Amino acid sequence: MRLPTRHLLGIEGLHPRDISALLDLAESYVLLNRSGKTRRDVLRGRTLINLFFEDSTRTRTSFELAGKRLGADVINMSVSTSSVSKGETLLDTAATLNAMNCDLLVVRHKASGAPALLAQKVDAAVINAGDGMHEHPTQALLDALTIRRNKGTLAGLTVAICGDIAHSRVARSNLLLLTAMGSRVRVVGPPTLIPSGIDQFGATVFHDMREGLRDADIVMALRLQTERMSAGLIPSAREFFTFYGLDAAKLAMAKPDALVMHPGPMNRGVEIDSQVADDATRSVIREQVEMGVAIRMAVLDVLARTALAHA
């Protein structure tokens, strides 16, 4: 398969058939990873640079693993020790990296639109690994893969996304993907953390947690993005947990076989209770991490093929 463009900057613009094809390819990489084998021929001779302007554990590490398992030369660029810390602009950094002739550039940045700007300035294929409050496409893809593997489909499912919706790029990308694939999406949280107009994107808004979770197939908890918040949006973390923290009592409103998800990192006792997070029968949080490697292998594979087609 090939994507419409040589970059992956967001879910917006991806056709449902592209999403399905990426998920299908990722399925094959799940099996490959579990077998302990690699496909080092896929990206042999290609260079992948991870350029992260924000902290990351799961995303950066899984892209590194994905690249190495496909045979790429992977470079993790430390922004804190790079020329960026000395005042170099994003565009100058882009020009420098472009001169090095890398093939794949994975970018995380606090500013919405930064990966799209880089994509205009470099010859490499650019993958958005999270930009501000805008999008996090590979997170939505791995979430979709996790859901599909457990439920068999995305169409017709009711997915409740709970917590800090306003500041979450994960919520936006999931909303775009899930509605495109036929899921019914609810967003649940206090009025201060639900962006106005989100219903125009196909979401149903709930401010009562129990009502929002009623008969849901999937419950996705999101952390409070305190680094992006202004003061006064919530009274306290303790009060937030009382009304919007995912615990066993609130989860009981969902379907008996509802799955619990969280993109990480988790703040236990704030947006999710440990009992729920660690419930082996319902929580697929660790499976999400595993699916992250497979979906990123699929994305790197497809973008490498797409780049050849656009060459």
UniProtKB/Swiss-Prot annotation:
Pathway: Pyrimidine metabolism; UMP biosynthesis via de novo pathway; (S)-dihydroorotate from bicarbonate: step 2/3. Keywords: Pyrimidine biosynthesis, Transferase. Belongs to the aspartate/ornithine carbamoyltransferase superfamily. ATCase family. InterPro entries: Asp/Orn_carbamoyltranf_P-bd, Asp/Orn_carbamoylTrfase, Asp/Orn_carbamoylTrfase_sf, Asp_carbamoyltransf, Asp_carbamoyltransf_Asp/Orn-bd. GO terms for cellular component: cytosol. Its EC number is 2.1.3.2. Carbamoyl phosphate binds at R58, T59, R108, H136, Q139, G264, P265. L-aspartate binds at K86, R169, R223. Catalyzes the condensation of carbamoyl phosphate and aspartate to form carbamoyl aspartate and inorganic phosphate, the committed step in the de novo pyrimidine nucleotide biosynthesis pathway. This is Aspartate carbamoyltransferase catalytic subunit. SUPFAM superfamilies: Aspartate/ornithine carbamoyltransferase. GO terms for molecular function: amino acid binding; aspartate carbamoyltransferase activity. Transmembrane segments: none annotated. GO terms for biological process: 'de novo' pyrimidine nucleobase biosynthetic process; 'de novo' UMP biosynthetic process; amino acid metabolic process. Heterododecamer (2C3:3R2) of six catalytic PyrB chains organized as two trimers (C3), and six regulatory PyrI chains organized as three dimers (R2). It comes from the Bacteria. It catalyses: carbamoyl phosphate + L-aspartate = N-carbamoyl-L-aspartate + phosphate + H(+).
